[in-house]
C-alpha cells in the first residue's frame, strides 16, 4: 500500500515543475554563477530570474507594492534558519546600544528563539511575550511592551506547530510607531495566507515549504535597513552573503514560487476542502490545539488524553505525521509552543500534528485519519 504523507509543515513534496527547472543546472549547465565567462553568466542569469520569481510571489496582486530594487532586495540563503539568524544578528549589530532590545513571541521557531537567546548573552535585552490559549498575541499587551528602546520585533506569520496566524500587520504597525524594525518569519505562511509585505522590514522564506528544494531560502530586506553580514568570504549577494549560490537550487525555488503564485487560489480552495472534512473521521475525545478561526487550514494539531504519539506512529506506519510534543532536540520534553498555549505536559505529550496540502487527496486524508483514530482507540482500550 502506498504511504500517505501528512507532514507538510516539516517539508512539502517537490513540485515536478521545480524538479524540471533544476535538472539542467545539475547536469551540463554546472558553471559557477559568479564566474565571468559565458557559462558563468548564463548561470547568473538563471539565479536572477529565480530571484524575480520569488519576489513576485512575495508581493502578489492585488495587494501589490511596486517591486523594484529601491523598495527592497531579496538575498538567497541556505534556508530560513540562516535567513532568520542573519536578520536578527545582522540588524541588532547595526543598532545603537540603547536600541538593542528585542521583542518576540513565546511560540516562535527555535531559529528565532535561540538566536534571540544568543543575542541576550551578547548583551541585548530580551522580552518574550506570552500568547493566549488560542496561540494569538494580545495586541494591547504587545503595545505596552514595544517601547522607544525596542530595536527589533520578530513574529511568525503562521506557526509551524499549530498553524495559528498572527496579526502581523498590526504587530508591525506597533513596531514602526516606536521606530523598531519588524522581522517576519513567513516560512509557513508564504503563498498560503496574505503577507503584509509593506508593513515588514525583513522577511524570511524557505523553498522546501512551498514545494521547492531543500537547502535554499531567502531574506527580503527593505531599502534602508542595514545588515551586518553573517557569512564572510567571497562577497557574493552584493557583499552581504558570501558563498557560491547553487543555480539549481535557486531555479527550483523560483519555479516553485512561480507555480505557487499561479495556483494560489486553487491551492487555497483545496486546503479549505481538506480542512472541512478533516475532523469528521475522528472519534470523540480529540481536541484541537490553537485557534480554529485564525488558522492556516493545512494544519491539524490535535490531542487525545492518554494517547502515546510514538506508539501511534509505530502502529500506523503507512501515514507520515508528527508527534506534536517532541522538541527539536528529541529530548522528549513537551513542545514549547504547546506549553505556551497553556497545555499541561501530559496534554502536550498526547498531541499529534497532521499537515496536508496541494498533493493530498481527500481519500488519502480520510483513510489516514480513520487509521489514526482506530489505532488510538486500540491504545486506550486494548480489548478492541
Regions found by a protein language model. Give the residues of each.
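Pyridoxal 5′-phosphate
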Residues: 1-384
Amino acid at each position: 500500500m502506498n504511504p500517505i504523507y501528512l507532514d507538510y509543515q516539516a517539508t512539502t513534496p517537490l513540485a515536478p515543475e521545480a524538479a524540471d527547472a533544476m535538472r539542467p543546472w545539475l547536469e551540463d549547465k554546472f558553471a559557477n554563477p559568479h564566474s565571468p565567462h559565458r557559462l558563468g553568466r548564463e548561470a547568473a542569469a538563471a539565479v536572477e530570474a529565480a530571484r524575480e520569481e520569488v519576489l513576485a510571489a512575495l508581493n502578489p496582486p492585488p495587494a501589490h507594492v511596486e517591486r523594484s530594487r529601491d523598495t527592497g532586495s531579496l538575498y538567497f540563503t541556505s534556508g530560513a534558519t540562516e535567513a532568520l539568524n542573519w536578520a536578527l544578528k545582522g540588524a541588532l549589530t547595526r543598532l545603537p546600544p540603547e536600541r538593542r532590545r528585542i521583542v518576540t513571541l513565546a511560540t516562535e521557531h527555535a531559529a528565532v528563539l535561540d538566536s534571540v537567546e544568543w543575542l541576550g548573552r551578547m548583551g541585548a535585552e530580551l522580552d518574550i511575550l506570552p500568547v493566549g490559549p488560542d496561540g494569538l498575541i494580545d495586541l494591547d499587551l504587545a503595545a505596552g511592551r514595544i517601547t522607544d528602546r525596542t530595536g527589533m520585533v520578530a513574529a511568525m506569520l503562521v506557526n509551524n506547530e499549530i498553524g495559528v496566524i498572527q496579526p502581523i500587520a498590526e504587530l508591525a504597525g506597533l513596531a514602526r510607531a516606536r521606530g523598531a524594525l519588524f522581522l517576519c518569519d513567513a516560512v509557513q505562511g508564504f503563498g498560503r495566507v496574505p503577507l503584509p509585505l509593506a508593513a515588514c522590514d525583513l522577511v524570511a522564506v524557505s523553498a522546501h515549504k512551498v514545494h521547492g528544494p531543500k537547502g535554499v531560502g531567502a531574506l527580503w530586506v527593505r531599502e534602508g535597513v542595514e545588515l551586518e553580514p553573517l557569512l564572510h568570504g567571497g562577497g557574493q549577494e552584493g557583499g552581504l552573503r558570501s558563498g557560491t549560490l547553487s543555480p539549481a537550487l535557486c531555479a527550483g525555488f523560483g519555479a516553485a514560487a512561480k507555480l505557487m503564485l499561479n495556483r494560489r487560489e486553487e491551492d487555497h480552495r483545496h486546503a479549505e476542502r481538506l480542512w472541512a472534512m478533516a475532523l469528521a473521521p475522528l472519534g470523540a475525545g480529540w481536541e484541537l490545539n490553537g485557534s480554529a478561526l485564525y488558522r492556516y487550514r493545512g494544519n491539524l494539531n490535535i490531542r487525545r488524553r492518554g494517547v502515546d504519539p510514538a506508539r501511534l506512529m509505530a502502529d500506523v506506519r503507512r501515514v507520515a505525521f508528527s508527534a506534536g510534543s517532541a522538541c527539536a532536540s528529541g529530548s522528549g520534553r513537551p513542545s514549547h509552543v504547546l506549553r505556551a498555549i497553556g497545555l499541561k505536559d501530559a496534554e502536550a505529550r498526547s498531541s499529534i500534528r497532521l499537515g496536508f496540502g496541494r498533493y493530498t487527496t481527500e481519500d488519502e486524508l480520510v483513510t489516514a485519519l480513520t487509521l489514526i483514530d482506530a489505532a488510538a482507540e486500540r491504545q486506550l482500550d486494548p480489548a478492541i
